Amino acid sequence: VYYAKNWEEDYIESNNIDRVIYFISNITKETNKVRKKLISLHGGNILTISFEQFVLNPDLWMDKISSTIGTSVTNATIRVMKEQNVPRDMVSQGIDLDIYRRCGWEPPRENSTERDELNIRREEIAREAGKEALIVLDRLSKEYETQYWNPGYN
């Protein structure tokens, strides 16, 4: 399988949850390599926006995007953002579609915080993930939260 290149043995020996964790780890490494190369080629002129920051505060990011590419926000843009429930009060307040539910999405629990929702998802994953894969997931989460978005702890 092409997306398991250079980690085929881990892929074959892993369960589905571990495969996803290892895939995310490997795609993150590859993305970081390409990002470094692009930054050196383009003098650091790369705009990276986390999904979480965007759905919680889209106006700031839409202004940055439009000024970067020399365009403006249109009514069509605003319509699509409304269809996607952007802005949101919580990241996990996505649009309620059957396809998302089939893939495991659930609306946030009443009175939960962002951290509560992340902890719930981690507990679900931990039931099936191997010990080593869970360590990788926790490392990835920590790195992501340090670099892009940290909802804090209760």
Which functions belong to the PLM regions below?
Residues V1-T48, F54-N154:
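PAPS-dependent sulfotransferases, especially Golgi type II membrane carbohydrate sulfotransferases
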